[in-house]
Amino acid sequence: MITGADFYHVMTAMVPLYVAMILAYGSVKWWRIFTPDQCSGINRFVALFAVPLLSFHFISTNNPYTMNLRFIAADTLQKLIVLALLTLWSHLSRRGSLEWTITLFSLSTLPNTLVMGIPLLKGMYGEFSGSLMVQIVVLQCIIWYTLMLFMFEYRGARILITEQFPDTAGAIASIVVDADVVSLDGRRDMIETEAEVKEDGKIHVTVRRSNASRSDVYSRRSMGFSSTTPRPSNLTNAEIYSLQSSRNPTPRGSSFNHTDFYSMVGRSSNFAAGDAFGVRTGATPRPSNYEEDAAAPNKAGSKYGQYPAPNPAMAAPPKPKKAANGQAKGEDGKDLHMFVWSSSASPVSDVFGNGAEYNDAAAVKEVRMAVASPRKADGVERDDFSFGNRGVAERDAEAGDEKSVAAAVSGEHGKPGLTPAPTAMPPTSVMTRLILIMVWRKLIRNPNTYSSLIGLIWSLVCFRWNFEMPAIILKSISILSDAGLGMAMFSLGLFMALQPRIIACGNKVATFAMAVRFLTGPAVMAAASIAVGLRGTLLHVAIVQAALPQGIVPFVFAKEYSVHPDILSTAVIFGMLIALPITLVYYILLGL
């Protein structure tokens, strides 16, 4: 039975964390103490120093030789069960997809163990539970977050290959990635492919950063983007971002802005014949509302500076081609004209600053490209949630699922038709090597990787031969790690204050996400724990830790790879607000 003293211990451990979070929220939302730029600096300090040193402190002081193998087995079994079920669902169900597999896996199995779990479980069950939480943290940092990177990069590789080599992917013998490319996700790092057929008749592909990325930097600056959304960092993968909410629960279709344009141009391949940029018209065109944005150029110009006026004669649509029977040939797309402003300045300057405006008419280039007519809108409002709220075609374009049938816009008058998806992918060895390279580049840029591995190695050595860390090093680390917990919660409060909405994905989706986080995860953990033989207090600890709020790192990955970031944002923010009463309910019920 839970006593008043037990409840007080829990409150003593948790209230200070929420005080730090509320102070940060009020500093931005109510008192306007911090600007978005300053918030970005604080978050960067937390990501680079506070959290990695906090992880190192907990891991290095935990004795790995006394780890509870059954507890670790229960946690591992829970994640494997969820992953297996989601994999079967994604392959057997028409509504399944790799994106939803990743998102649901994150929601159900990856809680905020480091920041919330250790102090909460210590307050509930004592010091030994803190050691159990450290074991979970080690597995998360070294195994499960790495697995998520594998899935994200696999998704990016499939999209890249499906878009650039829809008919010849099976003939690819090698894929070489330039050293400055750190992700295959073209929405974040604008990349292009170059293919060469060698004497063996196989295709050899080179992936490199697109030259358009430099123009994109300055187009964003000239369009007046501010620093409310901190720039993603290749260094940490642990930044806290301000999320731009989308209309659909699953953010697929987007307005055709400069970033989208350069992503399309940047990922072009010169393998097949095409236009000057090598843009291929795929079977699954993406919706665009570029013409709506272009309808009011004066308004945008008055706000962001003077732009050279487009040439109406050059922008006139071409006449439709005549078919053999004399009738106008049905076109499922139209010509899109864009005027690109480029600059030769250094691309490493501030992207989001309010610097000089670029209005040099001589630097303007006209780009003409074919854009397919948009599909009929899905009509899914924020609250209308289903796994099928995006078409099968769009799922094929995004996830590259060769087993799905893409519903494309084809035929006369834009009537929908069916186009088979690519049926071949590069050999498994080529894909495996490609993904391993990209994941390795991600890991070596993440300070949490180093802190976890160094902490684990140090603990293995010092507890084996009874070494003690030199006092000067210990105090140098502790002076920052002691602030890590409070700064992590403070950073989370800043993140919450920067969001336009606490519930960014709609009420129905938020309810579903909370059910997965606080009901499905603990239920699967309970089954896995009982299966491996956990009983008593260990079983209670396993269930309560599975009911912790959503981890922040999965949201960072979701934002970085554009895979349901609104859902993960809601899970982090709203989940943090309701986590304490929910975990207390679990604590009380399990103690009866």
Curated annotation (Swiss-Prot):
Molecular function terms from GO: auxin efflux transmembrane transporter activity; identical protein binding; protein homodimerization activity
Biased composition (Pro residues): 309-318
Tissue expression as described in the entry: Expressed at low levels in roots and leaves. Expressed in roots, stem bases, stems, leaves and young panicles.
Membrane topology qualifier: Multi-pass membrane protein
GO biological process: auxin export across the plasma membrane; auxin polar transport; auxin-activated signaling pathway
Extracellular side: 1-6, 60-70, 122-131, 474-476, 533-537
Gene Ontology cellular component annotations, sorted alphabetically: cell periphery; endoplasmic reticulum; plasma membrane
Residue segments, region Disordered: 214-236, 282-331
Keyword Transmembrane helix carried by entry: yes
Entry's localization field: Membrane
Chief location of this protein within or outside the cell: membrane
Chain positions recorded as (indol-3-yl)acetate binding sites: V51, N112, L114, Y145, I552, V553
Cited InterPro entries: Auxin_eff_plant, Auxin_Efflux_Carrier, Mem_transp_PIN-like
Protein origin, superkingdom: Eukaryota
The entry's keywords: Auxin signaling pathway, Membrane, Transmembrane, Transmembrane helix, Transport
Compositionally biased intervals (Polar residues): 224-236
Positions in the Cytoplasmic compartment: 28-38, 92-100, 153-452, 498-511, 559-571
Transmembrane regions listed in the UniProt entry: 7-27, 39-59, 71-91, 101-121, 132-152, 453-473, 477-497, 512-532, 538-558, 572-592
Free-text function comment from the UniProt entry: May act as a component of the auxin efflux carrier.
Subunit note: Homodimer.
Family that this chain belongs to: Belongs to the auxin efflux carrier (TC 2.A.69.1) family.
Name of the protein in question: Probable auxin efflux carrier component 1c
Organism expressing this protein natively: Oryza sativa subsp. japonica
